[in-house]
């Protein structure tokens, strides 16, 4: 049996920027002294004249990206999620979001899977922050195939986009030949009648693993991949909730303000349903290997399985 291919989505980001750079002269990449870590260094090597290192000044980087957008460029500003969404929030909101400029934010090292860098660098709040900015699209791809498609879709989209990428290498679960990406459209990975599991990012694969374990116990779980958290695919969420009667959300992010909150917002208005949110529960991260932290914070397939089984009791 062949080993499952694993790739970090930050690598997908950097490699796709190079591909797009060859196709489009107006693409410009900005970084904040982290080109090696965000993987935009490969773009810098290929197109040094279109790569701008802004130094450790993320707010300034957002302002520069905004200015470039007004000149017809398509800037991708890149940094760790903690800095792109956290430190630069004011400038992203006021300089990019308010005028609705065509800036793309490539945020790497999101969530607890950042690992050894610890709590100060593990951003579990970025989705919540970016969701609040009017007109901001928020995308959290689950694997290499989806990440590459998301970067391309972000380039084609006219307006601000926040792209969330990870440091940890994760299984490639999508087929590059058949996969289709559309902003705002969720993907049903497995049909089911007893409960709907809605996942995003690296938790999508874990949700699929949990569904296999649930099936062995006679629980038929529907699994949905929500790569676009804003705008949310409300039609799919509502229809699935009405079909199964119970919903579980899974995310490598705080349960406050992320995917779970977005799903609850939609269902409370259109189809009140019992929902269990699985994620980071009102706490900070800690230092340790990314894969081990996923297990400790109970975001792995077996932990999800146990929680869903308890929810169904």
Label each PLM-derived region with a short phrase.
Residues 1-164, 169, ...:
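Thiamine diphosphate
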């Amino acid at each position: 049996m062949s080993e499952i291919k694993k790739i970090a989505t930050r690598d997908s980001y950097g490699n796709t920027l190079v591909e797009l750079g060859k196709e489009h002269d107006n693409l410009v990449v900005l970084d904040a002294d982290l080109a090696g870590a965000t993987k935009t260094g490969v773009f810098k090597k290929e197109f040094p004249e279109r790569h701008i290192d802004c130094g450790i000044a993320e707010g300034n980087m957002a302002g520069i990206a905004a200015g470039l957008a007004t000149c017809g460029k398509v800037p991708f500003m890149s940094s760790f999620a903690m800095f792109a969404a956290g430190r630069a929030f004011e400038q992203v909101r006021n300089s990019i979001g308010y005028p609705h400029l065509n800036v793309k934010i490539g945020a790497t090292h999101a969530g607890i899977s950042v690992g050894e860098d610890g709590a100060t660098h593990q951003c579990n709040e970025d989705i919540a922050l970016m969701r609040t900015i009017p007109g901001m699209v928020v995308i959290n791809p689950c694997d290499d195939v989806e990440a590459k498609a998301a970067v391309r879709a972000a380039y084609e989209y006219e307006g601000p986009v926040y792209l969330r990428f990870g440091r940890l290498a994760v299984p490639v679960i999508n087929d590059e030949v058949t996969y289709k990406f559309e902003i705002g459209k969720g993907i049903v990975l497995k049909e089911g009648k007893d409960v709907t599991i809605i996942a995003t990012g690296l938790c999508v694969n874990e949700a699929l693993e949990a569904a296999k374990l649930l099936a062995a116990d006679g629980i038929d779980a529907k699994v949905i991949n929500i790569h676009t958290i804003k705008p949310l695919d409300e039609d799919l969420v509502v229809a699935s909730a009405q079909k199964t009667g119970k919903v579980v959300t899974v995310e490598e992010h705080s349960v406050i303000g992320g995917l779970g909150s977005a799903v609850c917002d939609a269902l409370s208005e259109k189809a009140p349903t019992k929902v269990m949110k699985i994620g980071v529960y009102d706490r900070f991260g800690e230092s340790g290997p990314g894969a081990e932290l996923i297990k400790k914070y109970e975001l792995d397939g077996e932990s999800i399985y146990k929680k869903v089984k308890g929810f169904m009791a």
